[in-house]
Amino acid sequence: MDLARQIAMELLDIQAVYLRPQQPFTWASGVKSPIYTDNRVTLSYPETRTLIENGFVKQIQKHFPNVDIIAGTATAGIPHGAIIADKMNLPFAYIRSKAKDHGVGNQIEGRVYSGQKMVIIEDLISTGGSVLEAVTAAQSQGIEVLGVVAIFTYQLAKAEQAFREADIPLVTLTDYNQLIKVAKVNGYITADQLVLLKKFKEDQMNWQS
């Protein structure tokens, strides 16, 4: 089994991902979604965590071999990023969603330098907005962001467009298409539910109609 399928299976097994087309979740944006993802759960399962961190290292070495520093997004990317940096013997920093309003007002915590080549770690890509704000924060300090690596992406067109416009490569360990395929093969969803899940990916506002 390849890594993408293996991680998709793990996310389903440990209930980091819930698929509920008949009882949709409501996202913070108000969108009714047949899927809910909480990849923070992966940290509680050592075998799953090791699989994910080794997958991160493999993808970084493959796509971004010249990396100087690993950064995690606050808060979900921090634990994964710290483990990855340790495995790769690289410096680590994390990037807040906004600068602190006290102290020295840092948005990036850790020792970073202009000219460093950074890879940013995120756990989940939905629209891509928050991690691309982290990219901008790093770039504003003269850091070269080589790319973003995440556990999972919903593969929404809005996110793909945002990464293209930002000219930032995105690499994920697994994705929505892989997950729903694995879910169907392993009996987590029915054929009818698979149809709804495919419709959601294409049209988040009208998939239920």
Curated annotation (Swiss-Prot):
Pathway where it operates: Pyrimidine metabolism; UMP biosynthesis via de novo pathway; UMP from orotate: step 1/2
Enzyme class: transferase
Catalytic activity, reaction form: orotidine 5'-phosphate + diphosphate = orotate + 5-phospho-alpha-D-ribose 1-diphosphate
Positions bound to orotate: S126
Bilayer-crossing regions: none
One Pfam family of this chain: Pribosyltran
List of residues binding 5-phospho-alpha-D-ribose 1-diphosphate: R96, K100, H102, E122, D123, L124, I125, S126, T127, G128, G129, S130
GO molecular function, a single term: magnesium ion binding
Keywords: Glycosyltransferase, Magnesium, Pyrimidine biosynthesis, Transferase
Residues making up the signal peptide according to the UniProt record: none
Swiss-Prot/TrEMBL cofactor(s): Mg(2+)
Biological process annotations from GO: 'de novo' UMP biosynthetic process; pyrimidine nucleobase biosynthetic process
Coiled coil stretches, renumbered: none
InterPro entries: OPRT, Or_phspho_trans_dom, PRibTrfase_dom, PRTase-like
EC number: 2.4.2.10
Highest taxon of the lineage: Bacteria
NCBIfam families assigned: pyrE (TIGR00336)
Family: Belongs to the purine/pyrimidine phosphoribosyltransferase family. PyrE subfamily.
Primary role: Catalyzes the transfer of a ribosyl phosphate group from 5-phosphoribose 1-diphosphate to orotate, leading to the formation of orotidine monophosphate (OMP).
Complex formation: Homodimer.
Protein name: Orotate phosphoribosyltransferase
